[in-house]
Structure formats: C-alpha cells, structure tokens
Amino acid sequence: QNLLKNLKYDKPITMLDLMNHQAGFEDYPLYIGSDKDLGALMKKTPSQIYEPRTVTSYSNYGTALAGYIVERVSGQSFADYVHEHIFQPLGMEHTALKPDLSDNRYVQKQREKEKTYDTEGNLLKGDVPFVLGEYPAGRATGTFFDLKRFAQALLQKKTLFKRAETWENFYSASHTYPGTDVPVNAHGLWATEFENTRTLGHGGNSPGFTTSLLLDLKSGIGSVVTVNQRNEFHFAIAMPDLIYGRKKEASKASQRDFQAGFYREARIFSKGPLSIFRVFKSTSYLDNPSENAAIKDYFGFWTAGEKGGSYRLNLPISDRMKLSLLDVIKDYGSLVLAGLALLYVALCYLCGILAKLYRLLLRKNKGSNSAVWSIWHYLTGSIILWVF
C-alpha cells in the first residue's frame, strides 16, 4: 500500500502484468546500489508511461517488484524463499542471490575471480564486477552445473511443483501476439518460434557476460549457454539455432502489409539525462523487420498492426512503436539543438580562457561592458549545463 508513487493510470497492476512485462513502467537505471532492503528499493518508482496490459516493455523494476510481493506474501526475504523452495530442493549448492552474494560464501569468493575477454580472446583488465541493485531481477549468480540442474528440473517437470496442472498452467501462454494464439510469454518465460518447434526460456546479460536457458517441451530438449566474452550475443543467438533449427519468420502477408517508417522501442528512459538514448539508440528506420538483422536473428517471428490508436511492431522483450514524422522531427531537432547548446557552452568557456590569457600576457584590463558580457555568457552556460 502507498508503495508506487508514479502511477499514471488507474488500471490496477496484476502479478500477471509483471510476469508479462506489461505493467507500463519506463526503463530504469541498473546502477542504483545494492540495498538489501527490497522494500526501500521499491520506493524508487520509475514513471508509468504505458497503460497496463497494452504494451510489452521489459522492466527490471517490475521483476523486482514481483520479488517484493513474494516477500510480503511469504513473510521471508526473497533470497531465503528461493533458497528454501528452489535451490535446496534441486541441490543447487553453488548459487547465491543476495546483492552481496553473502548467502553463499563459495560463490562470493569465486565471483571475485571471474574474468571476461574481448573478441580476440584477450583478457579485459580492470573490470569491476557488475552489481544490479534490484537483486531479484538478475542478481542470481552460480555455476553452470547448478543452472543445468535448474533447467533439467524445469524440463522434466519435477520437484518444484506438486501438482501436474501447475506445470501445465506455468507453461501455458499468458500473453499472445494480437489476433493469434502464438505465445509471446508464458508466465515469465519468453517464447521463441522455430520452424519445427517452440522454446520457452529466458536470458540474462551484464557487461561481458551472457546466459541463456531454453526449453523445448515438445522434444524434451533443453539448452544452457553461458559466455564470458564481449559481443557474446553472437553465441547466445547462434548456438540455439544449431540445436532447434531455423527460427520461424513472420507470414508473407505480415511482411507485405508492414508499414515502413521510424520505430522506437517501448523500453526507454522517458525523462532525465538517459532519455537521450531513445533518439539514437532505441529509434531506427524499418522497411521490413524480417530483413533487419537484429530482429531476424534474435526473434524471427513478429506481428504488426494498430493497437490503442497507434501502429506497432509486436515482439518479445519490447514492442516497437511507429513514430509520426512530427515525432521524428521533434526528437532529432531537439538533439541538434542540444548539441548546439553544448557547443555554445564549450565555446564560451574556451573563449573566456583564451581572453584571460591574452589580457594576462599583454597586461590589459577589460572594461565594464566586457565584464557584464562575460558574466552573461558564463551564467547562460552554467544554466545549460544544469539543465543537462
């Protein structure tokens, strides 16, 4: 109660919305500390920029919020609950979950020894272990063999749930592509369509490290991929294709009817300094998503159409919203103006320094008008920097 302060919509957020990443939250900075008090961490609420159940936008905050709900319902810390109900029953003796990894001394020590490499296989020195503040949303750290045990338990449908119907419900679609019965998400597991099968799974990424877990329930085959090399996405994407076959593409009709234009990922920072990334990182021109390397290799299948008054590309992880020409002009125009403003500030300070050196060398005093003019430039420059 009174936990979420920045809710824009009256529609309640459900646990299923959090699993489907459809609570409507903007993206949130990951480097926010390692506070062990999850309740205090959850009070740092990101803005709600979409109405619940209308847009898929991956949210670490939403996942952490689900973990906090588990704490409130169970009366245990999230880490203790997971140890008791998952790690211990499955014999996962080398996996930790707390922000400082103090719940497993072995993992805590081994984590300090981890190394990551560049694309040429050279050791990257000076890397500091990545800390994700919202620890239920990715802080789990353990060995490959523990992750394999977890994957086997999920694939064999044993130990974790007592009733068979719970397993069936867990693996059923909780969110589908609009107008189809093709699943996007199954209670937190992302669906990937291959030509001859379908997988459910999830991945995790931090600088230099990637982990992927996929389950093919139809054939009873699963895969776990862990990589500690930069550009690791190539391994995480390509290796499953060797196991499950080619990814299924969107229908010919979807590709034919797709509306080309500028699209923006729904997962964005809506305000603050990081919002600038939505212009040049999260926005791109799409003619046919099936010809876009990132979409084709990572997702394969997609649909598109009108929803809620806007045309969008429907994908796992993050939908992509089509932008109007006016939106594009405003965004890139703002970026140009911001660049000019920063250039103005740089020139003001540079000219000021050069002028001082000139007067110092020639022993000339500046007049009162020059002093007022300098103060005006410095004040304007300081205001611009403060805004940014």
Language-model-detected regions and their locations in the chain:
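Short, surface-exposed loop or secondary-structure junction motifs
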Residues: 3-217
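Electropositive phosphate-/nucleotide-binding environments in soluble metabolic enzymes
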Residues: 141-144, 233, 237
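Peripheral terminal and inter-domain segments
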Residues: 197, 234-388
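Short, well-ordered beta-strand elements
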Residues: 202, 212-228, 312-315
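Residue-level signal for short, function-critical loop segments
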Residues: 69, 228-229
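A short acidic/small-residue loop/turn micro-motif
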Residues: 131, 230-232
